[in-house]
From Swiss-Prot:
Compositionally biased region (Polar residues): 324-355
Function noted in UniProt: Binds to membranes via its F-BAR domain and mediates membrane tubulation. Plays a role in the reorganization of the microtubule cytoskeleton via its interaction with MAPT; this decreases microtubule stability and inhibits MAPT-induced microtubule polymerization. Plays a role in cellular transport processes by recruiting DNM1, DNM2 and DNM3 to membranes. Plays a role in the reorganization of the actin cytoskeleton and in neuron morphogenesis via its interaction with COBL and WASL, and by recruiting COBL to the cell cortex.
Effect of E400R: Impairs interaction with DNM1
Phosphotyrosine, modified sites: Y391
Keyword Amino-acid biosynthesis: no
Positions where Phosphothreonine occurs in the chain: T181
GO cellular component: axon terminus; COPI-coated vesicle; cytoplasm; cytoplasmic vesicle membrane; cytosol; myelin sheath; photoreceptor ribbon synapse; presynaptic endocytic zone
Subcellular location: Cytoplasm; Cell projection; Synapse, Synaptosome; Cell projection, Ruffle membrane
Membrane topology: Peripheral membrane protein
Name the UniProt record assigns to this protein: Protein kinase C and casein kinase substrate in neurons protein 1
GO biological process: actin filament organization; negative regulation of endocytosis; neuron projection morphogenesis; plasma membrane tubulation; protein localization to membrane; signal transduction; synaptic vesicle endocytosis
Amino acid sequence: MSGSYDEASEEITDSFWEVGNYKRTVKRIDDGHRLCNDLMSCVQERAKIEKAYAQQLTDWAKRWRQLIEKGPQYGSLERAWGAMMTEADKVSELHQEVKNSLLNEDLEKVKNWQKDAYHKQIMGGFKETKEAEDGFRKAQKPWAKKMKELEAAKKAYHLACKEERLAMTREMNSKTEQSVTPEQQKKLVDKVDKCRQDVQKTQEKYEKVLEDVGKTTPQYMEGMEQVFEQCQQFEEKRLVFLKEVLLDIKRHLNLAENSSYMHVYRELEQAIRGADAQEDLRWFRSTSGPGMPMNWPQFEEWNPDLPHTTAKKEKQPKKAEGATLSNATGAVESTSQAGDRGSVSSYDRGQTYATEWSDDESGNPFGGNEANGGANPFEDDAKGVRVRALYDYDGQEQDELSFKAGDELTKLGEEDEQGWCRGRLDSGQLGLYPANYVEAI
């Protein structure tokens, strides 16, 4: 027997050189266009994150700057603390710049390169993809035709081998069977001879076609290599370009290498190191401690021309440097805060008590009883006047009430010189509110 045929012996490889396996290289061109879109989406999402973070920093700085300015901290440490808010504002601006660079530079750069590198066709797809497809198909067409002939020749040869083996088996078995006549035996022998001739013919043809394929293979490889290198050059441009873009993105994101960013933290450190505890203590001693001036009691001659009163006189609001006295609670509010509200917040850094000394508890604003007609401003009055809100009001301080137009509340005192009244909500909350925001019911 000249050979054997076994269909299971056929191997299907995944090599680039197999017919049609160039399609992965062609698909890479389409993938490159999609990857440009993916990178632009990636940059857009990061830009949104930068924008949101910048806004959060701004909101945080605004809120805490107000709290610090209205809080009890004072002096150089207050300035150091406030420097953190300045840092947040500046870093917010830098992250806004990052967002702008990502969108206006990096994303636009990718978009423009993609537009120049890929050209859409009217019928769909890209010109570059079609050119690669046509190039590979043209280079592979002659070799693919030879491979088709080779497969047919191989199949014919293997089939002839199979028939030869079957004929030989029948001829050998007939020798042991008594029922087979000499004439039948001769036919079986002739069949074996004919199959051997077929095997010889198909083998010669198979070998000839295989030789022809071998001759055309170098030209086939050269043509395929040429088209593949063109695709490689196109892909190389994409890879190099996207690497440059990623480096640009890194440069924009890496604020650690930004001179402005480093300057922000140098300034912050200087502001913090500028805080001086001893200076702050001296300031507090001179403005709120034993270092304050005092009109000590002195003997005063009776003057008949002056009105004589036996009741305790109220001390008129005394103008202090950078502060005004509020008659609502007897506290001094810094002029920097006077623009926010013309009364006293739950805590004002310049708070002083301007009451003259008396052994009568009526002069104590924190006393629990009344004397000489003086009421405790912090006591929950049992009586009051019901009023209705004309407008919405959101309290700006902890000691202010918040209400909506139409809400009813209880007015507990008369309007002070700066237009504020004390009142109580139905929930029991006590606080101040603008007098002209309500009307009597």
